[in-house]
Amino acid sequence: MSVLQVLHIPDERLRIVAEPVKEVNADIQRIVDDMFDTMYAEEGIGLAATQVDIHQRIIVIDVSENRDERLVLINPELLEQSGETGIEEGCLSIPEQRAFVPRAEKVKIRALDRDGKSFELEADGLLAICIQHEMDHLVGKLFIDYLSPMKRQRIRQKVEKLDRMKAKAAG
């Protein structure tokens, strides 16, 4: 298992639409494990494969306080959504930036687990928001796409500056 590099905006690879996983096998399970390692190392609560330059429909999530409730979503499909909510969202691909994003309050999804077994899940609260956020990544959408062009540009400039400062500090 290893920590993968997380892509940051404005990297256009974040806009690539992910392909369905054809077969859940040892390679896919290794990707899932690496994604969890990466998500935990980056202190995130969710990660889509697109964010680590793997363009397959794979999501890992853990919104628990103890970081011990792993959720794997392979080829997730949104079946139902209802209500309205939203929070100030952040994203590992848009470091240190947050913005309010409107979301459905409840979702029902179908997906495959780490072993390739199909399941359905009804979620609300932070889990529902996280599922929607990560599913957006699979179609090349970022939370900043919900913002005005001016706010989106301001965030992009801040992230680019932050990345330049980190690169300079690294030598």
UniProtKB/Swiss-Prot annotation:
Q: Name one GO molecular function term.
A: peptide deformylase activity
Instruction: Note the SUPFAM superfamilies from the entry.
Output: Peptide deformylase
**Which NCBIfam families does the UniProt entry name for this protein?**
pept_deformyl, PRK00150.1-3
Instruction: Name the catalytic site residues.
Output: 134
Q: HAMAP family, from UniProt?
A: Pep_deformylase
Cofactors needed by this protein, per the record, are: Fe(2+)
Which reaction does this chain catalyze? N-terminal N-formyl-L-methionyl-[peptide] + H2O = N-terminal L-methionyl-[peptide] + formate
Entry's EC annotation: 3.5.1.88
Species, as recorded: Cronobacter sakazakii (strain ATCC BAA-894)
Q: What does this protein do?
A: Removes the formyl group from the N-terminal Met of newly synthesized proteins. Requires at least a dipeptide for an efficient rate of reaction. N-terminal L-methionine is a prerequisite for activity but the enzyme has broad specificity at other positions.
- What keywords appear on the UniProt entry? Hydrolase, Iron, Metal-binding, Protein biosynthesis
The name this protein carries in UniProt is: Peptide deformylase
